[in-house]
């Protein structure tokens, strides 16, 4: 009887958890379409800014901080984009794992990484382990706005433009999760500054192939009023657009990861309920069989006694 009560209690608690998991899955499902569309809509603007920066760096000989790293400054900024809430599967743990790997590689290279964290789960993880954190931001990791992107970009810009003797950094890295589709989300490490030139693979076309289109050729720009002023103006826009794009694709990844995790948790809870129900029924059947056996045995004993 006691085992049956324990099984009933476990079934009841598991049913309650299944309802919570299913509700979380439905909420994530209602948010994922918007999160995906917002991330995709932000990409063209970010790509256009990046193309302009690429043109600045590739077609001019400049010594601006946007393109030239201070080799004498070993300090490096690393921004990790985690989540505020749990129940998102391996989302935050994957970011932390990749961040730790990046920090180890930077340490091995003689760098001095400074950690910046976005998301309550990440900041809690590092604070619990007494790790030094330069700055943290929390709130709405699954629905980030332009304001938080501006705040983060301003902080990182100040750190990057600050002289080395005043604690400035020579490189900016961001660790985030890129949304590929509902099933696949990949952790990426992006070096935002100094800007790296992305070389498109080119080949000599054969006689039967068409010549490369103008879309494959880097555009030419005229910089007014001057190259230096254009660089100063475009640098904060570049940082903000890249961070905003990373925040949005990370938010879509978090929502997709949460939906997948809650779907799996709901299925596991239902499977556990079925398993516990079978055990409960088997226990009931055994109890009934035992009672019937005792009744029959008692009846036989009484019959023999009367004879």
Swiss-Prot record:
Summarize the subunit comment. F-type ATPases have 2 components, CF(1) - the catalytic core - and CF(0) - the membrane proton channel. CF(1) has five subunits: alpha(3), beta(3), gamma(1), delta(1), epsilon(1). CF(0) has three main subunits: a, b and c.
- One Gene Ontology term of the molecular function aspect: ATP binding
Q: Which family does it belong to?
A: Belongs to the ATPase gamma chain family.
Give the principal location in a single coarse category.
membrane
In terms of CDD domains, this protein maps to: F1-ATPase_gamma (cd12151)
Q: Sorted alphabetically, which NCBIfam families does this protein's record hold?
A: ATPsyn_F1gamma, PRK05621.1-2
What topology in the membrane does the UniProt record assign? Peripheral membrane protein
Job of this protein: Produces ATP from ADP in the presence of a proton gradient across the membrane. The gamma chain is believed to be important in regulating ATPase activity and the flow of protons through the CF(0) complex.
Q: Which GO BP terms sit in this record?
A: proton motive force-driven plasma membrane ATP synthesis
Q: Which UniProt keywords apply?
A: ATP synthesis, Cell membrane, CF(1), Hydrogen ion transport, Ion transport, Membrane, Transport
* Record GO cellular component, one term: proton-transporting ATP synthase complex
Query: Where does the UniProt annotation locate this protein?
Result: Cell membrane
The record ties this protein, via Pfam families, to: ATP-synt
In the UniProt record, does the keyword Protease occur? no
Q: Which HAMAP family match?
A: ATP_synth_gamma_bact
What is this protein called in UniProt?
ATP synthase gamma chain
């Amino acid at each position: 009887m006691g085992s049956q009560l324990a099984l009933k209690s476990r079934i009841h608690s598991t049913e309650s958890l299944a309802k919570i998991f299913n509700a979380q899955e439905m909420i994530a499902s209602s948010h994922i379409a918007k999160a995906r569309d917002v991330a995709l809509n932000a990409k063209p603007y970010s790509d256009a800014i990046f193309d302009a920066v690429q043109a600045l760096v590739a077609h001019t000989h400049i010594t601006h901080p946007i393109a030239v790293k201070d080799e004498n400054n070993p300090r490096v900024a690393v921004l990790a984009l985690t989540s505020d809430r749990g129940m998102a599967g391996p989302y935050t743990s994957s970011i932390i794992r990749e961040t730790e790997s990046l920090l180890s590689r930077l340490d091995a290279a003689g760098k001095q990484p400074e950690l910046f964290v976005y998301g309550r789960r990440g900041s809690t993880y590092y604070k619990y382990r007494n790790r030094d954190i330069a700055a943290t931001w929390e709130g709405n990791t699954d629905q980030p706005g332009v304001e938080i992107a501006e705040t983060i970009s301003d902080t990182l810009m100040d750190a990057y433009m600050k002289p080395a003797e005043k604690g400035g950094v020579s490189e900016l890295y961001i660790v985030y999760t890129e949304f590929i589709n509902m099933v696949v989300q990949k952790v990426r490490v992006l070096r935002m500054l100094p800007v790296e030139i992305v070389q498109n693979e080119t080949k000599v076309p054969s006689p039967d192939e068409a010549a490369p289109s103008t879309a494959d050729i880097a555009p030419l720009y005229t910089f007014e009023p001057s190259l230096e002023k254009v660089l100063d103006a475009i640098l904060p826009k570049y940082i903000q657009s890249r961070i905003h794009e990373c925040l949005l694709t990370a938010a879509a990844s978090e929502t997709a990861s949460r939906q997948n995790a809650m779907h799996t948790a709901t299925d596991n809870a239902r499977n556990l309920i079925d398993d516990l129900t079978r055990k409960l029924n088997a226990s009931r059947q055994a109890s009934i069989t035992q009672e019937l056996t005792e009744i029959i045995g008692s009846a036989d004993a009484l019959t023999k006694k009367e004879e």
